[in-house]
Amino acid sequence: PAGILAGGEVALRISGVGYPASLFIKEKLSDREILRANYRVGYRFFPGKLARKPLPEIMPAVKPAGRLRFFVLGESAARGEQLADFSFSRMLEAAINDHSPEKKVEVINTGIPAINSWVLREFADEVLDLQPDLLIIYAGHNEFIGPYGPASVFGLARNRLAALTGIWASTLRLVQV
């Protein structure tokens, strides 16, 4: 049975069924590699039209020399919902670059409305692999009602193992279909 499931998963991935489960997707743009925020990552935690999306952030896959790269992880407040151009991450980036023009700082805002620490835990691992110079977590508003929270309608989990299993399963194409 495990071999059949593994074979089905591989076949679905090869045939392009489902979507990437990571927060960022590596792509080629002209002659350089970039990382683009995965607009479908919210499908892991929310059904269909209720899925939330990250901002359309794009950055070089390899951080340019001399540039500082900061990441903001969080919910709608971190995102700057409804006016992301006025989020604290955009203001932080502008303030640092205005105050110290010799230091180039980019602030990548990964805020997604309605998520909580179960989701942020997944994203933090991926962001830390990108070796940020600073990681800011602005969260706490959705712990009760967000995915796998005690009052959630999206993937209720009664314990840690159930939540982690559900999050892992959401990366499988067999579950996405």
Predicted features and spans:
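Hydrophobic membrane-insertion alpha-helices, especially the h-region
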Residues: 1-10
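Membrane/wall-proximal cationic-aromatic binding patches
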Residues: 15-100
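Solvent-exposed loop/turn segments at secondary-structure junctions
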Residues: 76-79, 112-117, 141-146
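Serine-dependent acyl-ester chemistry module
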Residues: 86, 141-177
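Structural motif
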Residues: 107, 113-124
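Short, well-structured alpha-helical segments in soluble
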Residues: 120-134
